[in-house]
């Protein structure tokens, strides 16, 4: 019996499908969600979101957000989320370099926090894209 997953951003519905398992990065570490999971509401951290369906793993890069889990449905409200195969690695690398430069030049704690958050997001995007590229080569 699958669990229904909806991944939504402010711009669009990214995914609405029945899946076998979801693995997400939360404030308390990675959490795996299977059908009939206990109800849960949690904050998502930037990281790799994995969906398993019919034995196939589909990775996404998520920049943060919230997740609501009910026994037969999961709703993820993400700040941003991208499928691994949609990530432009060159643009992500450029954004990472810009975030590092902003961090070095930060004049206040607020500027530093913003630059570090952007840097974390871009590092996640790069890691997910690179892992996807390795997986494709092995297939």
UniProtKB/Swiss-Prot annotation:
Keyword annotations of the record: ATP synthesis, Cell membrane, CF(1), Hydrogen ion transport, Ion transport, Membrane, Transport
UniProt xrefs under Gene3D superfamilies: F0F1 ATP synthase delta/epsilon subunit, N-terminal
Start and end residues of each stretch annotated as Disordered: 89-110
Pfam families registered for this protein in UniProt: ATP-synt_DE, ATP-synt_DE_N
HAMAP family listed in its UniProt record: ATP_synth_epsil_bac
NCBIfam families: ATP_synt_epsi, PRK13446.1, PRK14735.1
Complex and partners: F-type ATPases have 2 components, CF(1) - the catalytic core - and CF(0) - the membrane proton channel. CF(1) has five subunits: alpha(3), beta(3), gamma(1), delta(1), epsilon(1). CF(0) has three main subunits: a, b and c.
Protein's recorded name: ATP synthase epsilon chain
UniProt source species: Chloroflexus aggregans (strain MD-66 / DSM 9485)
Gene: atpC
């Amino acid at each position: 019996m699958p669990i229904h997953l909806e991944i939504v951003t402010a711009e669009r519905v990214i995914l609405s499908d029945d899946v076998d398992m979801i693995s997400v990065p939360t404030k308390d570490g990675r959490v795996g969600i299977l059908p009939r999971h206990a109800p849960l509401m949690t904050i998502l951290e930037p990281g790799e979101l994995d969906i398993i369906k019919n034995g196939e793993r589909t990775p996404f890069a998520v920049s943060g957000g919230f997740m609501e889990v009910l026994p037969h449905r999961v709703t993820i409200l993400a700040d941003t989320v991208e499928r691994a195969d949609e990530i432009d690695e060159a643009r992500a690398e450029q954004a990472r370099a810009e975030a590092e430069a902003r961090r070095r030049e930060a004049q206040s704690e607020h500027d530093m926090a913003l630059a570090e958050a952007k840097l974390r997001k871009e590092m996640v995007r790069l890691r997910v894209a690179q892992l996807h590229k390795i997986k494709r080569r092995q297939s």
